[in-house]
């Protein structure tokens, strides 16, 4: 892929521009940097509590617009541009149902810029300390946003505070979503995984251009939350990504999370939906692609709302095998990693969108019904789940709490721990955390029983309390929360610098060894050991073993990793 992107003609033209810069020079009122495709003119920003200005470059194209004949194809190189490109405006969102973002702003007390949507969306944003220039060789951190692979944007995250306080370069990038990012025909004509290939294109752009912004292409850390973390985990597993990054941080998401693979019957159902809505011939892949490429983006969005299997696939290229098999075979990129979860991943935000009635309390009958519906566990095995989670639990509140813990375990904690073990056993340095602090600013927008919910840590990682721009990520942070945020920014940046999050003035974060120590990120940071040991054993060993030995109609051999689950509410994109 890199040969296509490092086109000789583009390099020669870029060299001419560099020579011209020696006589012209940048304007004094805005930062200007060269890229291999042309010049970009950004703007400067400042953050609270720091004297270091930040150069901000928004909407830099890393690939050609995936329009018309490029729809459902690998991304192509971006085209050269003349003059200096304005990089002061946010790029458009990739096509999605933007109503989801609006609802998240209310529940999470955040604010995003007013952004339009477009199929032309393969852009990235860069936040660099103002002193950074060619030769600075600062660590680079590339952020992949979450959103269930259905929603999200690079431009709802502001990297200014992290760049200013920690002297690192932050890149936030976009990728195609939903049907645009994952449609596949099941053959060579459209193998799918376009979103992951977009991410490869962005990382290739970083390798070829980030030094002109002061970054070190040999020190690139990829990080993300939820679907973004799943992307990071997938990139670590993919042979196509080898050499494009050097460290990885996965916040509340890994590639073996159950819902990521849709069964064949659901794919077939979706093809019938496509045929009904668009009138396309679904029996011929070439004709189907030609038909879909001629449809409007609105028509495809309509399909997206009525289907459910636009997910990752083993394509033989990006994923040569199932993620669990790649982990088992130790054929992945063995690099330092941070993996973590929050202590109430399904406390409010995710269940509120799917079954809000459970939040007030539940009984065992309703809880088991929902477990069967959501997890597809056969009825004859539900008693095992009940014994594990509801034994000696009688009140509606106790049952609700156990049910929400169960969801968090299945979709986040257990996959995270299992992945960390595979990385550790492959010889790669691993650091594990559990984030435990519920933001004070959210106490009046969600129930009192909610602890650190899904995505709560993002505002701390990005230093949201120190931002001054039109992206509001952490309004009303307490002084203690600001201190925790500073510590988390330092941990993350130290890891990006050296592959080890530890440093002067920080509580020790032990590596994830056979003793399975992990860091408890709270106002008072401490060390824990063997996170959810019994629950991990139940889902990864006990239940699969009993199901495999049973004479009952066979269920999935490893329910944790092969459940056919599609939760459209999962992986909200917001901080």
Curated annotation (Swiss-Prot):
Its EC number is 3.1.1.1. It catalyses: a carboxylic ester + H2O = an alcohol + a carboxylate + H(+). Pfam families: COesterase. Residues 1-27 form the signal peptide. One of its GO terms (cellular component) is extracellular region. SUPFAM superfamilies: alpha/beta-Hydrolases (SSF53474). It is found in: Secreted. Keywords: Disulfide bond, Glycoprotein, Hydrolase, Secreted, Serine esterase, Signal. The active site is at residues 226, 345, 454. Disulfide bonds join 94-121, 280-291. CDD domains: Esterase_lipase. GO terms for molecular function: carboxylesterase activity. Involved in the detoxification of xenobiotics and in the activation of ester and amide prodrugs. Belongs to the type-B carboxylesterase/lipase family. This is Carboxylesterase 5A. It comes from Canis lupus familiaris (Dog). The gene is CES5A.
């Amino acid at each position: 892929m890199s040969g296509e992107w490092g086109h000789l003609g583009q390099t020669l033209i870029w060299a001419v521009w560099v020579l011209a810069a020696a006589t012209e020079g940048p304007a004094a009122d805005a930062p200007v940097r060269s890229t291999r495709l042309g010049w970009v003119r950004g703007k400067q920003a400042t953050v609270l509590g720091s004297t270091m200005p930040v150069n901000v470059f928004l909407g830099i194209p890393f690939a050609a617009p995936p329009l018309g004949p490029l729809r459902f194809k690998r991304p192509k190189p971006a085209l050269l541009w003349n003059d200096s490109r304005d990089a002061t405006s946010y790029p458009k969102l990739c096509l999605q149902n933007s109503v989801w973002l609006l609802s998240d702003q209310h529940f999470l007390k955040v604010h995003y810029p007013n952004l339009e949507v477009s199929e032309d969306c393969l852009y990235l944003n860069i936040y660099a300390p103002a002193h950074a220039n060619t030769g600075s060789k600062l660590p680079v951190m590339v952020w992949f946003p979450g959103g269930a692979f259905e929603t999200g944007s690079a431009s709802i995250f502001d990297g200014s505070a992290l760049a200013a306080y920690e002297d690192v370069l932050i890149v936030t990038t976009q990728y195609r979503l939903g049907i645009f990012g994952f449609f596949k025909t099941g053959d060579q004509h459209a193998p799918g995984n376009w979103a992951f290939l977009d991410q490869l294109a962005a990382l290739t752009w970083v390798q070829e251009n980030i030094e002109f912004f002061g970054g070190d292409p040999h020190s690139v850390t990829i990080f993300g939350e939820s679907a973004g973390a799943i992307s990071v985990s997938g990139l670590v597993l993919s042979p196509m990504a080898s050499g494009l990054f050097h460290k990885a941080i996965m916040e509340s998401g890994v590639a073996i999370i159950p819902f990521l693979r849709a069964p064949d019957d659901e794919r077939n159902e979706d093809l019938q939906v496509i045929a009904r809505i668009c009138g396309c011939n679904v029996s011929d892949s070439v004709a189907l692609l030609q038909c879909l490429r001629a449809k409007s983006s609105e028509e495809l969005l309509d399909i997206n709302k009525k289907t459910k299997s636009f997910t990752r696939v083993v394509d033989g290229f990006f994923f040569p095998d199932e993620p669990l098999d790649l982990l088992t075979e130790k054929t992945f990129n063995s690099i330092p990693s941070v993996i973590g979860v929050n202590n109430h991943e399904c406390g409010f935000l995710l269940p509120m969108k799917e079954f809000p009635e459970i939040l007030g309390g539940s009984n065992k009958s309703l809880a088991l019904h929902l477990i069967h519906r959501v997890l597809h566990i056969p009825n004859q095995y539900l008693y095992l789940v009940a014994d594990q989670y509801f034994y000696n639990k009688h009140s509606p509140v106790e049952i609700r709490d156990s049910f929400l813990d169960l969801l968090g375990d299945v979709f986040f904690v257990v996959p995270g721990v299992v992945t960390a073990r595979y990385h550790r056993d492959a010889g790669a340095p691993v650091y594990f955390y559990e984030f435990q602090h519920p933001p004070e600013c959210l106490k009046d927008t969600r129930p009192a029983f909610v602890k650190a919910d899904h995505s709560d840590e993002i505002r701390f990682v990005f230093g949201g309390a120190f931002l001054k721009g039109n992206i509001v990520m952490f309004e009303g942070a307490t002084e203690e929360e600001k201190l925790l945020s500073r510590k988390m920014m330092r941990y993350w940046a130290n890891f990006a610098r050296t592959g080890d999050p530890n440093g002067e003035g920080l509580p020790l974060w032990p590596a994830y060894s056979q003793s399975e120590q992990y860091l408890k990120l709270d106002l008072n940071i401490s060390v824990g050991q063997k996170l959810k040991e019994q629950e991990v054993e139940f889902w990864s060993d006990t239940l699969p073993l009993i199901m495999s030995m049973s004479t009952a109609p066979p269920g999935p051999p490893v329910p944790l990793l092969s459940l056919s689950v599609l939760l459209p509410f999962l992986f909200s994109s917001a901080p």
